[in-house]
Amino acid sequence: MSGARRHRLRRELGSIGIALVLAWAPCLAAADDDQPPSAGEPDNPFYALDTKNLFGFLEGADVGEKGDRSLEFETTGSFGEAEGLYRSIEQEFIFEPTLTDSLGMEFGAHVLGQDVQRVPGLPDFAGVNFMGASVEFRYVVIHRTAEAPIQVTLTAEPEWNSIAEAGQSAADFSTTFRAVADVVSSDRRLYGAVNLAYAPDGARLPGQPLQDTSILSASAALSWRFTPPLMFGAEADYDRAYGGLVPREFDGQAVYLGPTFHYQVNEKIDLSAAFLVQAPAGRLDFDQFPRELAKLRLEVQF
């Protein structure tokens, strides 16, 4: 890639970073003025946490309380292909209202920055583009209680994208259907979650026929609170790629393993992150799935 193109990419990614800092700074500054969340019981400093963002790439089952509103800034990185250089960073800006104690929604706008060089089947590209938009519906079907600390939530997330890999124009429509279950220990120190997902996708590049694909995935995570605001954990994801909206022709699979992190800054602000690496499960598949995945998320309630 030429020096001019690299400079342009750094400038565009830098502009995104500056915008994020400006957006986050007032929220983080407000952390000094807010009181930390209070414990549920006088003898237990481990107060209740919203589980939705505790588990890295997995989702927790909480949707919040009626009337809650929040903004999320979610950065997802994908790195590495079988050959060449592949780096992709997606920035999502999310508005999340809770309509009832059982129903929540998310409205997202997506920006994509990519640096792709010498990857077979893809043109060389470096740049940043507006990618698309999404809506997520979250509905709790089984609520957590003191007697049964398990919660189950069903989600559906339709998404439209106008940009494909390597900056190619596309008309891409997908929907991710997810079953989410999580459990919290009685002392609120150990958290676990399981996600099952089905994601059909239909995409058309200019001058090419419609391509129908789908992904089935199963994920699990465990997290432990070392202090009331600080949590570390581990995540395992198993993904299978197929041709067809209804899984038909098997195209590849990947197992990802890695650590997760969550920090409750104060009652209204939390920060979470995860880093996953494709682990040996037979042959490593870098054709359908990247080598590494990373996520950083900031949520601000208001």
Where would I find each of the regions flagged by the language model?
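Cleavable N-terminal export/targeting peptides
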Residues: 1-47
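Transmembrane beta-barrel domains of Gram-negative outer membranes and organellar outer membranes
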Residues: 31-302
